[in-house]
Structures are given as structure tokens and as C-alpha cells.
Regions:
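Signature of N-terminal electron-transfer/Fe-S-associated modules in redox systems
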Residues: 2-173
Length: 173
């Protein structure tokens, strides 16, 4: 069940959502009381963004709203507030480098500069081939003991050196 409707009673916009994403959304909806279904929006948007290529289209946000049974504006508010969501086309692999205090003191700024030089892009840009997107700076990613660190596609990489970064980037083709 989804809200007060079964999965078979979907709207045309639900065609944007894969069966895998619908299952993931349903799993999150089941964790909350029916009057708190908005609590599943972040998980739903994250699943959709990952599933459809790294950013949220208006059609995808509409489909999430329809599927969960929320006003579209509530989904747009979440998608545009949190830095984990992209609403424009970006590279396939999302890179976030922590440059907060622990990472900064351990070379995070140098790691970021190395990535910018290696990829030929600045923060907020994608490579011309669409392979990488260097996200705007994230807040602390809570891996201070193993600084400097970065995330690529939500996977943590810690104790970075320029050589380790090159190996990581080479694996993400």
C-alpha cells in the first residue's frame, strides 16, 4: 500500500519510478505512521536520483509526490533545500571532498585542488564527458579520524593522498 492506494492504482507519472525504487519507497513508508509519510521523502528522492542518472527532474519529483501522496511543493522544498540533491544534469559520478577543520588540517584543500587539476573542472562543474561531477563543498562528513576524506557516489574514501585519489578516479569509469 502507498498512502491509501495500492501500487496498482498508480498515476501515469509513476512510469518514472522503477519497480526497485517503488519497493525502496514502500520500505521507507512502512517505517512511519500514515500521517507521517512526508518522513520518507528524503529516502525516496535519494533512491530516484540514483536510479535516473544523478539528478532530479521535475517529472521525477512529481512522480515521488504522487506516489507518496503529498503536495508537489513539499517534495520540491526538500529537493531544493538539501545539498545532496541535484536538480540539473550533472556527471555520473558525484565527488564530494570534505574541507572542514580536520580534513583541512590534514590536506583536504590540497586533495580538492588535485581533483580540480586532474579533472580540469572546478567545484560545481561536471567533466565535459559527463563522467564526474565535483559537488559544492559538503559539511563535515564525520570521518575526522581518517582525514582527509571524500565521497564518490556516497562511498567514503579516507586517509587520502593524491595517488589514492587517482586510483579511485580511475576505477570510476
Amino acid at each position: 500500500l502507498r498512502g491509501n492506494r495500492s501500487v496498482s492504482e498508480t498515476t501515469a507519472k509513476d512510469g518514472v519510478l522503477s519497480e526497485h525504487v517503488k519497493h525502496e519507497i514502500d520500505t521507507w513508508l512502512a517505517k512511519f505512521p500514515p500521517d507521517r509519510k512526508r518522513s520518507a521523502v528524503i529516502a525516496a528522492l535519494r533512491a530516484v536520483q540514483h536510479d535516473i542518472g544523478g539528478y532530479l527532474t521535475r517529472e521525477a519529483m512529481d512522480a515521488v509526490a504522487d506516489y507518496i501522496g503529498l503536495p508537489k511543493v513539499q517534495v520540491y522544498e526538500v529537493a531544493t533545500f538539501y545539498s545532496m540533491f541535484e536538480t540539473k544534469p550533472v556527471g555520473r559520478h558525484h565527488i564530494s571532498v570534505c574541507t572542514n577543520i580536520s580534513c583541512m588540517l590534514c590536506g583536504g584543500e590540497e586533495i580538492l585542488a588535485h581533483i580540480e587539476k586532474r579533472l580540469g573542472i572546478k567545484v560545481g562543474e561536471s567533466t565535459p564527458d559527463g563522467r564526474f561531477y565535483l559537488k559544492r563543498e559538503e559539511e563535515c562528513l564525520a570521518a575526522c579520524n581518517n582525514a582527509p576524506m571524500m565521497m564518490v557516489d556516497h562511498v567514503y574514501y579516507e586517509n587520502l593522498t593524491p595517488e589514492k585519489v587517482d586510483e579511485i578516479l580511475d576505477r570510476h569509469k
